Amino acid sequence: MSLYQGDKALEALSLGKETQYHTHYDASLLQGVPRRLNRDSLSLTADNLPFHGGDIWTMYELSWLNSQGLPQVAIGHVELDATTENLIESKSFKLYLNSFNQTRFENWHIVEETLLKDLTACAKGRVHLTLYPLSHFTSQPIVDFVGECIDNQPIEIDNYQFDSQWLNGSTTDTLVEETLVSHLLKSNCLITHQPDWGSVMIQYKGKKIDREKLLRYLVSFRQHNEFHEQCVERIFHDIMTFCSPDTLTVYARYTRRGGLDINPWRSNCEFVPETGRLARQ
């Protein structure tokens, strides 16, 4: 998108550039992206956000050496609060985690402390982190968003350019409280334009939203270039702008890349996100 072109924060990223893998711990590999880059275009300010929320990351490829040199593995769960100044750029996150591979740590607690310290410093805000042994996940089933899937509609689409106007005039006077789900969300990385595949849950209370128009709107992200977190905030903003629901939650879970998946959520009401893996995760 042209509104990001020339921004120094993006030009400094390792994303889209040839990089070397570091096998010893290096916190400087982490890179943050100011959330304001997207929020300025939506007229959102840090001191008056219309939502709360977080960016939930799952770290599947985390390994280090114990004090005897024996490799250790874990799966990590990280959540950045939506109020952090920066989001974490995913390639830098991957490179940072790889730097643990040949580094010795005395115990798991020190690894957790190190990760939390570095991610908090990069995000410039509140971060929660927990490491789990692999056994923690062996009995966890694949789940699905609970809601009505809107994907199987007999409609024809031939335009895949982003257009928020699909939501204009999309409500009726019927008041509802419902949860809608689509697995057709696809956008592209802001820098590399690599595809990002996701499922999205939209939970709202207010005037009924036309499901065909909502699906056309979501499909219009198909050639849109933004980070995962930015797309979710844009969806939240556009639904609030055009549909004016009393309450709204938008929660997307994306497929993993480089051993990481990103699952942003934004809400203006009480909401606790389920963190179970979806079928494509």
UniProtKB/Swiss-Prot annotation:
Q: Which InterPro entries does UniProt cross-reference here?
A: GTP-CH-I_C/QueF, NADPH_dep_7-cyano-7-deazaG_red, QueF, QueF_N, QueF_type2
Pathway field:
tRNA modification; tRNA-queuosine biosynthesis
- The UniProt entry's coiled-coil ranges are none
Entry's EC annotation:
1.7.1.13
Task: Name the Pfam families on file.
Answer: QueF (PF14489), QueF_N (PF14819)
- Catalytic residues (UniProt): 189 (thioimide intermediate), 196 (proton donor)
The alphabetized list of GO BP terms reads: queuosine biosynthetic process; tRNA modification
What keywords were assigned to this record?
Cytoplasm, NADP, Oxidoreductase, Queuosine biosynthesis
The protein's annotated catalytic reaction(s) are: 7-aminomethyl-7-carbaguanine + 2 NADP(+) = 7-cyano-7-deazaguanine + 2 NADPH + 3 H(+)
Xref: HAMAP family: QueF_type2
The family line of this record is: Belongs to the GTP cyclohydrolase I family. QueF type 2 subfamily.
This chain's protein is named: NADPH-dependent 7-cyano-7-deazaguanine reductase
